[in-house]
Each structure stands twice: as C-alpha cells, then as structure tokens.
Amino acid sequence: PFAAFIAQKLNLPMTYIRKEKKKFGKNSQIEGLLSQKDHVLLAEDLMTDGGSKLKFLDAIDKSGANISGIFVIFNYGIIKDYYLFKKKKIDVIFLTNWSDVLSVASRKKILKYEEVEIVESFLENMKIKS
C-alpha cells in the first residue's frame, strides 16, 4: 500500500487497517502494533466519500491511539462525510482534486474548454466539490 512508501521514507512503523475484521486467523482489523501513545496518520491513495476512512478511524479510536490526520493523494470531493471529519477535528490533507486536474488539463490543452465544462457540470450535478 501507499502508506508503506511513506513509512519507509520517514523511517516510521506502519500498521495496516482493514475495513472490517478478518473472518479467519486472528480475527483482527488491525495488523501490526498500535498503542495508546501512538499518533496515527491515515494514508490512502483515494478518498471518495470518506466512508471507508470512518471505518478506519473507528478502529484507531478503539485501539486508543491518537489520530493526527488523514492524507490522500486524490480527493474526489464527494462531501457526504467530510463534515464528520471536521466535527471530529480531523484534518484531511490531499495532494490533488478535480479542480487541479481540470485546471492543468485546460491549461495544457489536454481537454477543450467545452470538455472541461461538461466535466464540471457533471461534478456539480453529482454534488462533488472540485
């Protein structure tokens, strides 16, 4: 997973968290060590509506560890659960989103103006914050 690259680069331990507990083996949702003193940065490649992130955060909460924030490469901008993160005072940091991608695609003429408008209209109709 993407988190492994971050952990290796920063020389920090990595813990793997599943969306749900395994039905076999140790029957655990968390693989690796996680203690009450630990500070956790949840690192993922994508964030759609944040639903799976909430499951991960619940597992981290149950372990007693502290959640420092969520880092994703691409945020789709579906804001269904965004306010839950804000309410829990958890920062969501992302490298890019639809707005950035469309801006670069337009500036570099990868997409025509009309094509960018079509995508933006679609995103607006889907209530996706770009």
List each language-model region with its residue ranges.
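Short, well-ordered alpha-helical microsegments
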Residues: 1-3, 78-79
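Short beta->alpha connector loops at strand-helix junctions that form conserved
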Residues: 18, 44, 96
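A contiguous pocket-lining binding segment that forms or flanks enzyme active sites
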Residues: 33-75
